[in-house]
């Protein structure tokens, strides 16, 4: 708990710290003001009612009214400070967390689910805000109210005060037991919330797949399981709280009744005045109410602690992929690619083994092979989404680990089969990598990707907002917009991972012609299964089980009569025994 509070405090700007301290000081002062009216009620009873002297009545009532109004005004100011400052603190925290996510490496996103990260950015951060705006001052308020009331009542009659607070040690023990038992339940509940949000997020993102397989009922059952597990985790916490709260309430009410009874005996014996007993009845709630609130405050504290811990995991996560201290700046990427005895393993499992090849600037390298052979991993290593386990990947004769990440990735334009388009206009999606593009340049790149014809037929043309992931467009249309986006950055290395898998042969030929006549020179890195997409490449690699099984030009690989030749025969309908 201490670490979470310290982390939150450290992330508050100095002005918000000051305002928060001022708000808490106001809270302490308003707790002192709580003593005024009970003290005046003593005079009202003893000096006015019992003495039958109406002269002080108006003055006492005016002071009581002024105290009440002043206290409410101060508390209003306090709440304004706490609410506005907490919102600003969380705004800055959310901004910093989002920045952390931008520079986290791919391994981080491999481990953390989208729904879980969304929960940390929203619900968990909101509990941090709730701590600043409510929990912190309510704890201080409860402690100060109890202490001030106890001290003041001691000056009135220490024996009766002792009777009123005698159950404090018992309440402290009950509170400690409750706090220990509820903490793991909150951690469990937080995990169930994350699982439920992940299930909802995946269902919404994959709604087309759900409908395509008619799995609506299955998804309903799956979400129902997550939803019920979350509800059950809540109920377990409530069960603990419902056991704790009645015990507190019973003890507090019992001691209040005993206090009134004993106070009455003191009056009969002349050891206490009616006005002094009025003070005890008026302030007994100030001594007992903090214990009543304790259950809710412990609940809130445990939720805050659990949520803040989840946020801190993201906040303190260190990216494994970052600029080296001696990273080199380059004026312009030329596009030479070299894989030098590269091996790559994830959790000990080999993905690539001893891969070596080189491509000169302006050349085209194509990679094919069975699914799971490691083709896409080559791209990930080239853009340094991951670091090699052995060997080196070089761009322009410089190890990619010595490149500045922004320069390295800024020189690579990537278009993949699994297209992600933003909920933005067509123009905004194409110009995503270069916000300075003019509309004419956007149109030129969409034309080269053979996307201009269908884009111009959209309701608002290039200003048409396309849905998340390109909802409303066909697979081939999404791929062509993604290709236009990759071309628009004028990359030195153009990566195409099955980019034309969803387009027809005529469109593919048009795109290939356009790529051969780009207004800038670039090295093309193509991953494909179609022979037609790679037959003109300067170097073709066949990757099987993470190793290069074959390499050469189209003609050379046909002569080897290996995997490439077999694929060629199958795709062109040539019986292998007749193929030359």
What residue spans do the PLM features occupy?
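An intracellular "coupling" helix at the cytosolic face of ABC transporter transmembrane type-1 domains
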Residues: 10-15, 82, 106-107, 123-132, ...
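Helix-loop-helix
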Residues: 53-59, 152-166, 236-309, 314-315
């Amino acid at each position: 708990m201490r670490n979470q509070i310290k982390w939150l405090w450290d992330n508050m700007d100095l002005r918000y710290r000051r305002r928060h301290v001022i708000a808490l000081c106001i809270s302490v002062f308003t707790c002192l003001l709580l003593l005024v009216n009970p003290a005046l009620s003593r005079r009202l009873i003893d000096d006015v009612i019992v003495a039958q002297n109406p002269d002080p009545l108006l003055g006492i009532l005016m002071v009581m009214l002024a105290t009440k109004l002043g206290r409410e005004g101060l508390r209003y100011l306090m709440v304004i400070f706490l609410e506005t400052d907490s919102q600003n603190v969380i705004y800055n925290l959310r901004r910093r967390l989002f920045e952390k996510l931008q520079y986290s490496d791919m391994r981080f996103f491999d481990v953390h689910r989208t729904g879980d990260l969304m929960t940390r950015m929203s619900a968990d951060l909101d509990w941090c805000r709730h701590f600043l705006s409510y929990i912190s001052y309510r704890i201080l308020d409860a402690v100060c109210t109890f202490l001030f009331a106890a001290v003041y009542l001691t000056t009135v009659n220490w024996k009766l005060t002792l009777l009123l607070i005698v159950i404090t040690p018992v309440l402290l023990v009950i509170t400690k037991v409750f706090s220990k038992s509820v903490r793991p339940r909150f951690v469990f509940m937080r995990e169930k919330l994350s699982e439920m949000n992940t299930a909802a997020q995946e269902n919404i993102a994959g709604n087309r797949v759900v409908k395509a397989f008619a799995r609506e009922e299955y998804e309903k059952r799956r979400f129902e399981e997550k939803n019920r597990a979350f509800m059950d985790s809540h109920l377990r916490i409530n069960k603990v709280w419902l056991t704790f709260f009645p015990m507190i309430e019973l003890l507090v009410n019992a001691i209040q009744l005993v206090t009134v009874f004993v106070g009455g005996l003191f009056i009969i014996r002349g050891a206490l005045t009616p006005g002094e007993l009025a003070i005890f009845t008026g302030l007994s709630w100030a001594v007992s109410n903090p214990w009543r609130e304790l259950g809710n405050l412990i609940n809130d504290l445990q939720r805050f602690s659990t949520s803040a811990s989840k946020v801190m995991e993201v906040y303190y996560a260190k990216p494994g992929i970052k600029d080296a201290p001696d990273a080199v700046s380059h004026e312009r990427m030329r596009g030479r690619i070299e894989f030098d005895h590269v091996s790559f393993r994830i959790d000990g499992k080999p993905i690539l083994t001893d891969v070596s090849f080189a491509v000169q600037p302006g050349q085209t390298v194509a990679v094919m092979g069975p699914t799971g052979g490691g083709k896409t991993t080559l791209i990930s290593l080239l853009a340094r989404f991951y670091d090699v386990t052995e060997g080196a990947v070089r761009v322009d004769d410089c190890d990619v680990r010595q490149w500045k990440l922004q320069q390295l990735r800024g020189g690579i334009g990537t278009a993949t089969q699994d297209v992600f388009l933003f909920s933005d206009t067509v123009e905004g999606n194409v110009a995503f990598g270069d916000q300075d593009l003019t509309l004419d340049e956007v149109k030129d790149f969409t034309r080269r990707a053979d996307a201009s014809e269908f884009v111009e037929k959209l309701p608002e043309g290039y200003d048409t907002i396309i849905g998340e992931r390109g909802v409303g467009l066909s697979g081939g249309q999404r791929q062509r917009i993604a290709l236009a986006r990759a071309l628009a950055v004028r990359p030195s290395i153009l990566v195409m991972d099955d980019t034309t898998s969803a387009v027809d042969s005529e469109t593919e030929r048009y795109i290939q012609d356009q790529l051969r006549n780009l207004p800038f020179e670039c090295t093309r890195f193509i991953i494909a299964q179609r022979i037609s997409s790679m037959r003109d490449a300067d170097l073709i690699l066949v990757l099987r089980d993470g190793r290069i099984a074959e390499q050469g030009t189209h003609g050379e690989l046909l002569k080897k009569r290996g995997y490439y030749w077999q694929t060629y025969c199958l795709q062109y309908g040539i019986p292998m025994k007749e193929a030359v």
